[in-house]
């Protein structure tokens, strides 16, 4: 609001003017010669007055002159509207007077269109905002001195122009904020309905099979007309390795994802009466353990009987279908001749028959006690049978014999001899092969001479090998032969030693075996990354080698922790070694290249890189002189911030973003927006200079750092950005206002 027209300042300035007018009027009223009718000579704009006994002509108010020959209009407005009428006015001169009018946006305090300030009337500001709807739909009116401005209300954005605006001169209008469709969350979905107006919220949830750590699941529509970036990160549920079950082993392949089923079978000697044992991966990322357990089986051996004089048969009552059971058969024999010693031996038998039977190599004319029980870990109540073998004709000797196997690689030869203590010679021919090694062959041949009636020969056989053993009785008219097959089990001792890694992905080890004997090795490799939960690499393969010191190089991914299980197929015992591969250069940035010549640089679009070769640590935007592009090394660490840059010839880091701060879709980075990105200032480009803008991706893990770079843009003869020009314009306007203020203050 302005001050009244008769403030102290203007009144002091009018005082000399009034004194001057008084002097002029006094001069016009001087008396004339005696006898002259002075009043008749007064000017038409003068008045005759009687003063001190004399008549004088005085110009009327608003005129100046001698009152008789001259009374001219006095232009009161020549001293300025502010001095005459007051602030926010325009002065209008009239014959013999003047009147004042308030400027647009102001009104006179006497509520008339014109006024004379001598009654105290002055101009006061009009509050245009009292008129509703002045700024149209969505607009908010703000009163100013002599005018008003329009701004958009909360929930609205200006369209077709900036704020503030004037509805009569500007095309700007206010439109309701509409954020549109909310952003998508990978592997997530929006819960319920939503609106897209200011302040609206949408809630996200992970789809089945995925979960998120406790984070904000809400995205809001902001005043910028965009949705907040969702912070929900859905990760696939992975329950890891299934739990161990007492007296059970895990069988088959299983999935660690939601709904994956791990299946177990009970160990030898145990069973699950309630059914199959399974464990299921739940939505909590944990395994739901089975309520069923493996209980010990107590095998009952019934109905033991003798047949063919030396063969024994029995029955079992196991509830399992086709149970493969190992038996221990203890034999104790006493010849009818009390002078002969007691003979004891043990025979092992493995079979899945419910009515097992075994033929024993027994002496004739001997009392035997046979004890049958199951081998550990299976338990049973032992069964016992006693019997006597029949006598034979000592003169009968046809050279026939039979063979029984015990302790896996030992043979017992039983021949009816004409004479106790007679010498016999046997020829052994042994040939071993492995089904999984086409070139493997173990052959040996030897003679064995003995005087024992039931000699025992233990063979030196390789594990996990199928052997054919042919035994021929020499020095016999009929040269009787017996052929048997032996399948040796895997070795119970370790056959691999001194395993070590070299060249990051290669292994070497020492094989404990006979020289030049081919062996097959089974590899099971499992790779994981702590920084990439969804990553899982599993490999299974085998190799064959006859070397005592085999070596193999593996096809491993960079930046990964591996567990390698190595087992020789001839052994049951694997060895496990851990390997860690170092990271390599991250994938090249996916950028859209720009070349700009004397124009503003468009916003650069940053896309998130995939963590293929190691964890992504950060993204950097580097601004270099164009001349340095050909010599720039991506691995260089010399680039500094803009303010610590020693010379214009050096490059600087304009922005640095941590990988976790880069959205999954993309984000835009305007070059030269005068903002800080991390610790780095994004400075405007210098006018008239040539620049090269580079995007650098950094991967860091295990104290190793790798980079990859891509040229984002080339800027030649750079001009000021729109943002810079706006800043300069506002700065210039501020200077003009300050100088004008100082000029008025000095008056």
Swiss-Prot record:
CDD domains noted in UniProt? CCP, EGF_CA
The membrane topology of this protein is: Single-pass type I membrane protein
Q: What is the protein's given name?
A: Sushi domain-containing protein 1
The gene is: SUSD1
Organism for this UniProt entry: Homo sapiens
Covalent S-S links between cysteines: 39-48, 42-57, 59-71, 77-91, 85-100, 129-141, 135-150, 179-221, 206-234, 239-281, 266-294
- Point out the signal peptide segment: 1-29
Pfam families, alphabetized: EGF_CA, Fn3_PTPRU, Sushi
Name the GO cellular-component terms.
membrane
Gene3D superfamilies per record? Complement Module, domain 1, Laminin
EGF-like domain residues: 35-72, 73-112, 125-162
- Ranges annotated as spanning the membrane: 722-742
